[in-house]
Amino acid sequence: GTPGGEYRVVEVNPRVSRSSALASKATGYPIARVTAKVALGKRLHEIENEITGETTAAFEPAIDYVVTKVPRWPKDKFDDVEFELGPAMKSTGEAMSIGRTFEESLLKALRSSEYDPAVDWGDVPDGELEAEYLERPTPDRPYAILEAFYRGYTVEEIHELTGIYEWYLERFGRIAEAAESARNGEFEPAAEAGFTNQEIAAIAGGEFNDTHASWIPSEATDADAEDGRQVETDGGGTVVEDVEADTSRRTFKQVDTCAGEFRASTPYYYSAREPPTGRGASEVQIDRDIESVVVVGGGPIRIGQGVEFDYCAVHAVRALENMGIDAHVVNNNPETVSTDYDTSDGLFFEPITAEEIADIVEETNADGVMVQFGGQTSVNVGEPLEDELGRRDLDCEILGTSVEAMDLAEDRDRFNALMDELEISQPEGGAATSR
């Protein structure tokens, strides 16, 4: 859009594209399937909606949630490249998130993108924050906006610097306010805004034990050691345990194409942090007494990790189903087959973090988790997930190669030491890095 309210069409594709794939995943409406049937002569009212089983393709999808898509920027591979927004495409993939509010959906999308700004905001003065990070449209800008609000900037000031509509900036401001509340010991506003318990604990002065965070204010990580309120806990336990005791749990909602007007039977879910007086309990329709396994997907496509790993995840799901075991997928990439609602027994469109996967394990009563089929993303979540499952005392294990063995194989120094200990010959080698 433009300041005058006009919209400019950049391109039109007369075919199924990544945009239509995103629209399908966001609404649950099977655009490609319906398009194929229309091309064969079917009318919309003759095509059944498989999700509800009661309506037809002539019903326009209605949604009662917010969907956010963010690009995956390969800044970790090209540290010296300028990733300023322009006519040339520089992202390698994308992540999608679903939440009840814009704030919740945005924070889930930032976690899902697995992007970590290579900047310590505590070392960035206001002038540099404005000139380098707010005025310039770069991958760091969303985090800079949150940091600016946390420093006391107003909506009007940030609007002047970024040109972003005030409605969106007001939501960014609410996220920053929720973080400030968490820093002062009020955890529920941060939970409802979409922060994870691990993120809230880190904001409050505790440790962060997970793979990726959406945003943690610089002041929270630079807190004064003498500031007792940062590390005090109510019950003598860890900060994250206090956060869990004082906040609402995640409930899982269904993507049904009709905003709850008709009963849906397709197992396509997303989580929401709502207070007990919210819109009801979990909507998951899964038999918790059947043996089941959670398969962790690969998240957004990046250099070195593409759709070949999604192929692995989908075939893992099919192998489990052939064995009579329910397979549940957790992933957030709208471009993949694993996030089709009819690929698995349960699709959870969620960030790939230990906390959120552990919530899915609790919800489904899963017997095991497979992290070997999503590339480095899913392997990286193995260790914190094992810790989280143990902390919650859940009867669920990482299946296949153990987390310890995975680390042993990936850590070249440890692997070389093991080969020497076992007296197994290997070529001489070394590692070098420019950073």
PLM region descriptions:
Residues 367-373:
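Periplasmic-binding protein-like
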Residues 323-324, 391-406:
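Short, acidic/small-residue loops that bind anionic groups at enzyme active sites
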Residues 13-14, 362, 406-435:
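Active-site nucleotide/adenylate-binding loops and adjacent lid/helix of ATP-dependent enzymes
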Residues 185-204, 263-279:
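Intrinsically disordered, low-complexity basic tails/linkers immediately adjacent to helix-turn-helix/homeobox/MYB/SANT
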Residues 1-181, 190-193, 217, 222-229, ...:
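ATP-dependent carboxylate activation and anion-phosphoryl transfer catalytic cores
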Residues 42-50, 119, 156, 201, ...:
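Acidic/polar loop patches that form or flank catalytic/metal-binding clefts of enzymes
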